[in-house]
From Swiss-Prot:
Gene3D superfamilies: 3.40.50.920, 3.40.50.970. Homodimer. It catalyses: D-glyceraldehyde 3-phosphate + pyruvate + H(+) = 1-deoxy-D-xylulose 5-phosphate + CO2. This is 1-deoxy-D-xylulose-5-phosphate synthase. Its EC number is 2.2.1.7. Its cofactor is Mg(2+); thiamine diphosphate. One of its GO terms (cellular component) is cytosol. GO terms for molecular function: 1-deoxy-D-xylulose-5-phosphate synthase activity; magnesium ion binding; thiamine pyrophosphate binding. Thiamine diphosphate binds at residues 72, 113-115, 145-146, 173, 284, 366. The keyword Ribonucleoprotein does not apply. It is an enzyme of class 2 (transferase). Mg(2+) binds at residues 144, 173.
Length: 629
């Protein structure tokens, strides 16, 4: 059928099983074709086609609330709710968002992007329903990877205690982005092979009834036998003990099995957890056979061969970080690395190949990773926690309370710092400077290129004065020559890239090329601009700031971070605190709003951070030049 005609999920409710199976095949082909051009989260969505069809067949969205954890697996939901015609612009500037978006559709009742939030949101909605006296169903769909997150476990505990009518669909594909780790993953592994829980439970109850319960010690012994049998024979007891009715495992690609269990859950009082087994990448062989997470989120690819289309490019910043860390670790046994379920994205999977005993993937658990790093540091090791800027937010209290307060030697390698593009507002790494720079003991650096990055990694390893963060962007470097010998960069020192007499631009990282081009444009108007690589965001280069302030030149601070509370604010604070009240200073950075999806270049133009926009802004601070005769 024409998927663009699916303007409402009610249209599939009257379909036969055969028609739904045909629709599932058409949706898979649609996704494979569309995402081969736009890129996106292919593997997760191919795995939930039948599950999404079953949910929309049995429940009445948007009255019934479907909450997608992380949200990257909601493409099928978007197709069924009238958005198939927008997939040519998936994750493109001003196009269809890759995650649920409340202002995009009434069927997107909760926005996600980070993991492990759905159960808490579902608990809130179920509680509100009961307080208002309405009767809608609340269903949270969460993956086995996201279920390892501490917030999800906190919510399970609360939901089970309160006994709210709420359905949790556990989408178990044995992977999140990378293969899952941890004890809970092992519990789910045993459940996958345990057979149907409800049948086992009924058989067990029959067996227990045959155990006599007569007086005294014999009665106590009988109860112990009953408990032992229960734990021995019924694998679903983990969730039952949390207060849930457990259903499953259910074949996530069998519509009959899905429908039967969803119907049972719908009429069951109290919280229900349906354990659904799915195959990530179902229906497309390259994605089905992916064991590393390559097909979780992809760019352009060739459908026939499954070849990912990548243009030749210099090494990525993540790759340079990991290679440098390996190089140093060969001679420094103190170095250990941590990741929170992102070994591939951070490139620590390469570190793990060489140092498997010194690399720790803790799962989706940034809080735990941060404090574990602190524990390692107290014992004389040098822990390196590689984490995306947007995900470090999840471990903020631990950064404050456990690391900075104790002044522990933990190295935070902050990946994806700055705008990240297509993943949009939930993933832009623009807040870390603002939330880190005011913390006592924290140091923050950012390199201008990949060569400076390797020196900063070395500097951070050698630093013994407490916590230090080196932030670096998504994407590739510039292909410049890399120094063979690593050296320390003095913390608190800046670099003069270009001398000038009319104004000064203070910038760092990805904004340096923008500033260089802006200064060229201004030079054509007769202006001479001084350009500073402010690579040490904290501490500032106070000696240079004194000299700049005394020169009397206008100052422009330029950063690809939230302008409020970040680097520019620090410079203004310095001028104010030292009595330089006459220094004309202009801040430029990310405005006070969340930045949506699009290419980085499109987003920079939208928020006013292109070279011509920077040049125009700085020119307003400068006296007009007299035209030469």
């Amino acid at each position: 059928m024409d998927l663009e005609k699916l303007h409402d999920p009610s249209l599939i409710k009257s379909m036969t099983k055969q028609e739904l199976e045909q629709l599932a095949e058409e949706i898979r082909q649609f996704l494979i074709e569309k995402l081969s051009i736009t890129g996106g989260h292919l593997g997760p969505n191919l795995g939930v086609v039948e599950l999404t069809l079953a949910l929309h067949s049995l429940f009445d969205s948007p009255k019934d609330k479907l909450i997608w954890d992380v949200g990257h697996q909601a493409y099928v939901h978007k197709i069924l709710t009238g958005r198939a015609g927008q997939f040519d612009q998936l994750r493109q500037y001003k196009g269809l968002c890759g995650f649920p978006k409340r202002d995009e559709s009434e069927h997107d009742v909760w926005e996600t992007g980070h993991s492990s939030t759905s159960l808490s949101a579902a608990m809130g909605m179920a509680t509100a329903r009961d307080l208002k006296g309405t009767d809608e169903n609340v269903i949270a769909i969460i993956g086995d990877g996201a279920l390892t997150g501490g917030m999800a476990l906190e919510a399970l505990n609360h939901i089970g205690h309160e006994q709210k009518d709420l359905i949790v669909v556990l989408n178990d594909n044995e992977m999140s982005i990378a293969p899952n780790v941890g004890a809970l993953h092992n519990v789910l592994g045993r459940l996958r092979t345990a057979g149907k829980y409800q049948k086992a439970k009924e058989d067990l109850e029959m067996l227990i009834k045959k155990i006599p319960a007569f007086g005294g010690k014999l009665a106590q012994a009988a109860e112990r036998v009953k408990d032992s049998l229960k734990y021995l024979l019924v694998s679903g007891i983990f969730f039952e003990e949390m207060g849930f009715t457990y259903l499953g495992p259910v074949d996530g690609h069998d519509l009959d099995d899905l429908m039967e269990n969803l119907k049972y859950a719908k009429k069951t009082k109290g919280p229900v957890l349906i354990h659904v087994l799915t195959k990530k990448g179902k229906g497309y062989a390259p994605a089905e056979n992916d064991e590393k997470g390559t097909w979780h989120g992809v760019g352009h690819y060739k459908i026939e061969s499954g070849e990912l289309v990548k243009k030749p490019a210099p090494p990525s910043y993540s790759g340079v970080f990991a290679e440098t860390l390996k190089k140093i670790a060969r001679n420094d046994p103190r170095i250990v690395a941590l990741t929170a379920a992102m070994p591939g994205g951070t490139k620590l999977d390469q570190f793990a190949k060489e140092f498997p005993d010194r690399m720790f993937d803790v799962g989706i658990a940034e809080q735990h990773a941060t404090t574990m790093a602190g524990g390692l540091a107290t014992q004389g090791l040098k822990p390196v926690f590689a984490v995306y800027s947007t995900f470090l937010q999840r471990g903020y209290d631990q950064v404050v309370h456990d690391i900075c307060r104790q002044n522990l030697n933990v190295f935070f390698a902050i990946d994806r710092a700055g705008l990240v593009g297509a993943d949009g507002e939930t993933h832009q790494g623009v807040f870390d400077i603002a939330y880190l720079r005011h913390l006592p003991n924290m140091k923050i650096l950012m390199p201008k290129d990949e060569n400076e990055l390797q020196h900063m990694v070395y500097t951070a390893i050698q630093y013994e004065g407490g916590p230090i963060a080196v932030r670096y962007p998504r994407g590739n470097g510039y292909g410049i020559k890399m120094d063979e010998v690593l050296k320390e960069i003095p913390i608190g020192s800046w670099e003069v890239l270009q001398e000038g007499t009319d104004a000064c631009i203070l910038t760092f990282g990805t904004m340096i090329p923008v500033a260089e081009q802006a200064s060229k444009e201004l030079s054509q108007q007769g202006y001479s601009i001084r350009l500073i690589n402010a690579r040490s965001v904290k501490p500032l280069d106070e000696a240079m700031l004194h000299e700049i302030a005394k020169s009397g030149r206008p100052v422009l601070t330029l950063e690809e971070t939230a302008v409020q509370g970040s680097f520019g604010s620090a410079v203004l604070e310095f001028f104010h605190d030292h009595g330089y009240h006459n220094v004309v200073t202009q801040r430029m950075g990310i405005p006070d709003r969340f930045i949506e999806h699009g290419s980085v270049s499109e987003l920079l133009e939208e928020i006013g951070l292109t070279s011509s926009q920077v040049a125009n802004q700085l020119s307003k601070l400068l006296p007009r030049k007299q035209k030469r005769a």
